[in-house]
């Protein structure tokens, strides 16, 4: 379908066009930002399953392939799937705890994980039309709270990167902090003194400079790149036929529900940033793509997929809101899945370089949520309490991940997700305070939102 034929919002930023070179450069920014998260899930599961280094590399390539295809479908819109907004897709962290446990279970392993992923994806496609109707329960009060929580829940990732990453021999070493500060400072200077396209690719510029600097001082690790093949084709069912077991399937179905909750908040955030109203029809298309990607992923040796919150901040900070950018980024992910040496090169970007950029971008996500909260009646004490409690609930797994360690394992997709905790809290309290609180309060809040 042609972008120009889209009748929904003819003047929306999401259907702007850019020259090809600009598309590639801005799309590359999206890939560099999400790459670490995209390969983390297959890396963790591969290690838990006791795979060899070559098999883990194959898992990573499979994930990049599915992430690229899902990103293209989500952004472009094919058939009934795809929200047609600048969305990046990748393996979801919501299922990591459950999948690590499955990997160690006798008789389950990777084949059981892939079977559960396929079944959960099919389940998600069945419930997506019903889940899409919850958009009416996301007024600015709830949306702003959720988006603020998304930004805050991402911040530990940025800080971890800036300190050198989880595997750093000396986390927080002055050299890591200096590199992160240099990257962050360079972004600020570009936004202060430059205009136009230079601002659009500010993250790519400073990450390239940071990479070169780290290379000069010996901080770029290219070990394993020489042994990696130039070309590798991802084949379906590489690890054998998927197996279907009830307990893993039920666990992964719960994960899909949590993914839908998280994705709803992310889609609404993108709608605010790009100036598009996210309708139930659009939300259904987006959730169908999430579920369809997970269904497809199980056959191609990878895991449940969802929209990546990290990239929302990049859309806001650079001001490039056209979905053609993420379509190109999806194509780049597909290329990386076929070229292991190129994938090694991208993976060699030092964590401190990513951290400096991520501090600004993840902060922009939280700032977007705060801006949306201005549209709500935030002077009302009950609404203030809703925001306070929901953000607090969202920060629990961020501040102390082990806080809910003694609860049943099946609850971990909820209790380990700050986004899910904040969203469920905000929805519940809004229902209690404003919807069940009487038509007068609901009408009053609606009038306040329309005034803005």
Residue ranges of model-derived segments:
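Short, non-helical or kinked segments that cap or interrupt transmembrane helices
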Residues: 58, 80-94, 136-145, 198-204, ...
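Hydrophobic, membrane-embedded alpha-helices of multi-pass small-molecule transporters
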Residues: 21-34, 38, 172-184, 202, ...
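Membrane-embedded alpha-helical modules
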Residues: 102-221, 329-330, 334-443
């Amino acid at each position: 379908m042609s972008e120009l034929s889209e009748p929904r919002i003819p003047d929306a930023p999401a259907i702007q066009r850019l020259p090809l070179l600009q598309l590639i450069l801005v799309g590359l920014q999206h890939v560099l930002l999400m790459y670490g998260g995209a390969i983390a899930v297959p890396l963790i599961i591969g290690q838990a399953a006791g795979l060899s280094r070559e098999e883990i590399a194959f898992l990573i390539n499979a994930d990049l392939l599915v992430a690229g295809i899902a990103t293209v479908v989500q952004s472009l819109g094919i058939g009934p799937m795809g929200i047609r907004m600048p969305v990046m897709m990748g393996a979801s962290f919501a299922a990591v705890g459950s999948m690590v446990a499955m990997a160690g279970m006798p008789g389950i392993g990777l084949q059981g994980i892939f079977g559960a992923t396929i079944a959960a994806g099919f389940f998600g496609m069945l419930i997506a039309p019903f889940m899409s109707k919850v958009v009416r329960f996301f007024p600015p009060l709830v949306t702003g709270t959720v988006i603020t929580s998304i930004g805050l829940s991402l911040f530990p990732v940025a800080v971890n990167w800036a300190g050198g990453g989880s595997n750093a021999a000396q986390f927080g070493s002055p050299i890591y902090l200096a590199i992160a500060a240099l990257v962050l400072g360079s972004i600020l200077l570009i936004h202060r003194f430059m205009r136009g396209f230079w601002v659009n690719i500010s993250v790519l510029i400073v990450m390239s400079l940071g990479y070169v600097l780290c290379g000069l001082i010996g901080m770029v690790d290219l070990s394993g790149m020489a042994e990696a093949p130039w070309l590798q084709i991802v084949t379906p069912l590489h690890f054998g036929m998927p197996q279907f077991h009830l307990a893993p399937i039920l666990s992964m179905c719960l994960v899909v529900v949590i993914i839908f909750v998280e994705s709803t908040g992310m889609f609404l955030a993108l709608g605010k940033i790009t100036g598009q109203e996210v309708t139930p029809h659009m939300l259904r298309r987006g959730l169908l793509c999430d579920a369809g990607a997970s269904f497809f992923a199980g056959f191609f040796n990878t895991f449940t997929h969802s929209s990546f919150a990290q990239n929302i901040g990049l859309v806001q900070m650079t001001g490039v809101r056209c979905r053609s950018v993420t379509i190109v980024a999806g194509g780049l992910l597909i290329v990386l899945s076929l070229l292991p040496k190129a994938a090694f090169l991208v993976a060699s970007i030092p964590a401190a370089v990513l951290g400096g950029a991520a501090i600004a971008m993840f902060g922009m996500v939280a700032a977007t949520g705060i801006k949306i909260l201005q549209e709500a009646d935030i002077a009302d004490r009950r609404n203030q309490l809703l925001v306070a409690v929901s953000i607090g609930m969202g920060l629990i797994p961020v501040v102390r991940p082990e806080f809910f360690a003694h609860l049943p394992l099946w609850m971990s997709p909820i209790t380990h997700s700050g986004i899910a905790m904040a969203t469920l809290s905000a929805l519940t309290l809004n229902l209690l305070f404003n919807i069940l609180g009487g038509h007068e309060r609901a009408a009053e809040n609606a009038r306040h939102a329309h005034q803005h």
